[in-house]
């Protein structure tokens, strides 16, 4: 009887080791960029040479044209006496090592130009979408802006490994809504403290500190949100006091406008 129990324990122990090894292997496979579908190489673009890298998401071509990468926002390099955001130099160096002096393939967006006159385009190097590779390593956040969303599903999926592993920008994100104290890009998390309907959409206050503006065209996708829910949002924070002398009653100083459905998620 004792020997039978020992054999059973040995078999059970071996089975547990095999199961444990399986889950450990599956976990690391999940974190591997190779486990995620590669963004497709789309037709309709052109070849060009990159001669300068400004930062992690902007380059200059030999023609002189500046290009802003679609689908990603990387930390800002400090200018005019302001410090670099964490990870800014790392993202810039990564991009420079791969594309400076190289022939690349550029696929312009449906919206081809931003307000600074930069060409908006997907940038491929050796048939790989650069934004996808950067997101996989936590060098920036995925974005869906305007009509330039053809590869949004793929790019938002690409940031998952870095997020799970808390790599790069995900070491400090999401930020608590209560911590917002300056303009600029942010990925925040907070609890809904108030929802107010406006003429063109909804204002959603998080922790009585940060207001999100949700356009009416996106409101239907988030109709079930209610006070007390925890949500996550990403986008550019504005300081209302830079545009107006004082705040109206109940108005939050910090405002983040939701520009795409993917930028607002239940948490």
Segments from the language model and where they lie:
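N-terminal targeting leader peptides, primarily classical Sec-type signal peptides for secretion
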Residues: 28-32
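Small beta-barrel nucleic-acid-binding modules, primarily SNase/OB-fold domains
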Residues: 2-11, 33-267
């Amino acid at each position: 009887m004792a020997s039978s129990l020992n054999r059973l324990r040995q078999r059970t122990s071996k089975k547990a080791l095999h199961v444990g090894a399986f889950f450990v292997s599956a976990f690391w496979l999940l974190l591997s960029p190779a486990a995620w579908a590669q963004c497709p190489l789309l037709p309709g673009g052109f070849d060009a040479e990159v001669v300068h890298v400004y930062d992690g998401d902007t380059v200059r071509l030999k023609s002189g044209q500046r290009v802003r990468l679609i689908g990603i926002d990387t930390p800002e390099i400090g200018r005019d006496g302001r410090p670099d955001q964490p990870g800014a130099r790392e993202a810039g160096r990564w991009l420079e090592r791969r594309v400076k002096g190289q022939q690349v393939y550029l696929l312009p967006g449906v919206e081809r130009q931003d307000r600074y006159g930069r060409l908006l385009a997907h940038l491929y190097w050796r048939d790989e979408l650069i934004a996808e590779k950067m997101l996989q390593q936590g060098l920036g956040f995925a974005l869906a802006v305007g009509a330039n969303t053809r590869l949004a599903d793929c790019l938002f999926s690409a940031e998952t490994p870095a997020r799970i592993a808390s790599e790069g920008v995900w070491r400090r994100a999401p930020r608590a809504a209560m911590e917002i104290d300056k303009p600029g890009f942010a990925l925040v998390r907070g609890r809904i403290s108030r929802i107010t309907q406006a003429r063109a959409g909804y204002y959603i206050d998080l922790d009585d500190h940060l207001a999100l503006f949700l356009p009416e065209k996106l409101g239907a996708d988030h109709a079930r949100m209610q006070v007390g829910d925890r949500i996550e949002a990403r986008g550019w924070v504005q300081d209302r006091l830079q545009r107006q002398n004082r705040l109206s009653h109940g108005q939050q100083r910090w405002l983040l406008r939701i520009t795409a459905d993917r930028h607002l998620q239940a948490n």
